[in-house]
Amino acid sequence: RRQRQMCIRDSLTPLEGLVMGTRCGDIDASVVFHLMRQGGYTVDEMDTMFNRESGVKAMIGSSDMRDLDDLMAAHDPVGQRCWDVYVHRVKRYLGAYMAELGGLDVIVFTAGIGEKSPEMRFSCLEGLEELGIEVDEKANNHRMSTPTIISTPTSKVTVMVVPTNEELAISRHALQFAK
């Protein structure tokens, strides 16, 4: 908002939000009670299930998004379902953020699948042209080693891919503590 980064996440744990490699993302809270009653799970087992055994791993048997890419290339229906769930959640959050902020200036894809899967980026943004998001397919399909804009020149929302440099980020944080 007003050219400032915003994070709207205010949950207790990292479970809220998107489906992740091993985390479930948003779920109906009653699922917890149902599983404990019907499945006999303990609190610790539920914690392990939601944090380490859910998400993409529960859907395809692996938390590695490259395995999801392989399943998609093989036209596997289980892979397609996982892909659809992931894309649906991303689009739902984009819409929610746009509503809360009154629009978006920039969407940034980074790390893992955001950085390395042009197909996933395209799927997440496909059909959002009415919201001012237009992807340049040629730019999206290039391998990026520097921050790259992948939206069209006429897109109202700038879409970027920013390669992750975790070592640099860690070094910068460490320097702050060293001062």
Annotate each predicted stretch with a short phrase.
Residues 2-8:
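Short, small-residue-biased leader/transition segments that mark boundaries at the very start
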Residues 9-51:
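A conserved active-site cap/scaffold subdomain adjacent to cofactor or substrate pockets
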Residues 21-25, 36, 58, 83, ...:
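Hydrophobic alpha-helical scaffolding
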Residues 27, 51, 63, 102-104:
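Short gly/pro-enriched beta-turn/loop segments at secondary-structure junctions
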Residues 29-32, 65, 121, 171:
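A general structural signal for well-ordered alpha-helical segments in protein cores
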Residues 39-82:
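A mobile "lid/hinge" subdomain adjacent to the ATP/sugar-phosphate binding pocket shared
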Residues 80-104, 108, 114-179:
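Internal helix-turn-beta structural module
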